[in-house]
């Protein structure tokens, strides 16, 4: 698993071979975080630059993009001690078109408590003050036990909802019992007021993550990853419902993201099982294991970092594997079927026990960079894309 990301990937384009070269350089912007449960990106203060947001153990923070390399990313705390337990997830997106993100967070992280709503799970919308560098006002929303993941999703009519996924159903023991209920909130005009919501019965267990399926920025549905596999839920005229379709069946899945092979061909990347050992790609009727050398794989993204017209896969794991490694790797595909991939290290000098990662163009050069948070390493690292440097 040790190869520098000085990528010289041969691509077959119209029968000709062309070389694609890129590299990443890691920069630690914070080496004193507690856990780094979840990352998000977006313009927090309306200055036109993409900032970084982090759900840490007891604080919700954002890092102001300085707009130039090697300048410090100023850290601002916008919420702290929301519950007695840890924070666990964060969602940030500009849902009202004012050029600044709205932020929701999940807290009350207590995965072993599935019966007592007062001791497990919490969802908050954070109301920003005029000065977004100060503390934001938390608005407590409905919650289920073991809240774990959330995302803002855009409906076909252009309005947004907040989708929130627990890890367990109420009363579960060892991943057995009632199925998980996904919460889908409507956004009220008065965000300090009452948030209406629907509960989507997934009939799934240990639902660790989900992937919104958006086409041209409009939501078609979500794919939910859990103990039983990956199930698709659709968002139609009558609301949310199961499609009775399984993208992955009878295999435990912890992380899921979708990507493009180009020419209107899609693939799905997963980490299997939950906190698992394997990175897997599904394309058409193919299932390809890219590596089985992970230990507690916990972060996944698909995007085109190199302008190839197809997506690459970035993944991270948080515990030392058989040869003592933790880190972040990128996989570059080279065939139209999605069966052939090459693995590369982003930057060997940047050590990270990866809890979460997310792509974003932080320097405005048109290429996606990668932000990762490290659990045992207590750091936030930006991997700067050097394709055009």
Locations of regions flagged by a protein language model:
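Beta-propeller-forming repeat regions
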Residues: 19-389
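Sec-dependent N-terminal signal peptides
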Residues: 4-13
């Amino acid at each position: 698993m040790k190869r520098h990301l000085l990528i010289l990937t041969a691509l077959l384009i119209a029968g000709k071979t062309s070389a694609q070269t890129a590299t990443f350089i890691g920069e630690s912007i914070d080496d004193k975080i507690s856990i780094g449960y979840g990352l998000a990106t977006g313009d927090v203060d309306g200055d036109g630059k993409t900032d970084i947001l982090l759900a840490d153990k007891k604080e919700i923070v954002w890092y102001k993009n300085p707009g130039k390399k090697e300048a410090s990313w100023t850290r601002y705390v916008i919420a702290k001690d929301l519950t007695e337990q840890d924070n666990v997830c964060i969602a940030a997106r500009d849902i009202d078109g004012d050029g600044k993100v709205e932020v929701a967070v999940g807290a009350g992280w207590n995965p072993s408590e599935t019966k007592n709503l007062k001791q497990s799970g919490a969802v908050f919308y954070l109301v920003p003050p005029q000065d977004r560098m100060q503390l934001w006002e938390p608005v407590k929303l409905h919650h289920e036990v073991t809240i774990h993941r959330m995302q803002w999703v855009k409906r076909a009519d252009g309005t947004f909802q907040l989708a929130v996924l627990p890890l367990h159903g109420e009363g579960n023991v060892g991943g057995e019992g009632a199925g998980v209920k996904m919460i889908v909130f409507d956004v009220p005009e008065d965000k300090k007021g009452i948030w209406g919501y629907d509960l989507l019965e997934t009939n799934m267990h240990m639902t660790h993550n989900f992937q919104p399926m958006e086409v041209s920025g409009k939501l078609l549905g979500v794919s939910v990853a859990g103990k039983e596999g990956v199930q698709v839920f659709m968002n139609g005229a009558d609301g949310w419902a199961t499609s009775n379709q399984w993208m992955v069946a009878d295999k435990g899945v912890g992380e899921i993201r979708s990507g493009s092979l180009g020419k209107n061909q899609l693939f799905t990347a997963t980490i299997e099982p939950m906190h698992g050992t394997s990175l897997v790609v599904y394309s058409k009727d193919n299932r390809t294991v890219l590596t089985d050398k992970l230990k507690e794989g916990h972060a996944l993204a698909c995007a085109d970092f190199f302008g190839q017209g197809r997506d690459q896969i970035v993944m991270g794991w948080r515990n030392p594997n058989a040869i003592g490694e933790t880190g972040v790797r990128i996989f570059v595909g080279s065939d139209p079927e999605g069966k052939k991939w090459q693995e590369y290290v982003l930057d060997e000098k940047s050590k990270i026990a990866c809890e979460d990662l997310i792509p974003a163009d932080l320097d405005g050069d048109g290429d996606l960079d990668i932000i990762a948070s490290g659990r045992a390493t207590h750091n936030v690292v930006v991997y700067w894309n050097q394709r055009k440097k």
